[in-house]
């Protein structure tokens, strides 16, 4: 699976890595993290196991395949407790260039 997880219960400010600038082909390119997908998960015994199917479906969709292809590092997912719905909410983050962020936002955006 191309999407990994290294974060679980941090604060929102700790989920995003700091933006940075890197020189690629003689041009300065800015990279930053973007939330590219989210979905709810009910109160199940092993939510990470059940989250595999929606993560895989999104990864195989047009938007997910584009993000996996254009992400600078592997996209990663985060599980957060959803107190309003008595379950969990999963978020997928990807590190993209500014131009890729604009393209992604115009094409798919956060729905």
Identify the meaning behind each predicted range.
Residues 2-85:
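Structured alpha/beta or helical-core interaction and ligand-binding surfaces enriched in interleaved
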């Amino acid at each position: 699976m191309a999407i990994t997880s290294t974060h679980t219960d941090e604060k929102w400010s700790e989920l995003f890595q700091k933006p940075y600038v890197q020189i690629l082909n003689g041009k300065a390119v800015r990279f930053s993290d973007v939330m590219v997908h989210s979905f709810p998960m009910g109160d199940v015994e092993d939510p990470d196991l059940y989250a595999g199917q929606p993560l895989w479906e999104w990864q195989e969709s047009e938007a997910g395949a584009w993000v996996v292809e254009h992400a600078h590092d592997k996209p990663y997912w985060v599980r957060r407790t959803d107190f309003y719905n008595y379950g969990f909410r999963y978020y997928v983050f990807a590190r993209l260039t500014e131009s890729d962020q604009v393209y992604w936002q115009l094409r798919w955006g956060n729905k």
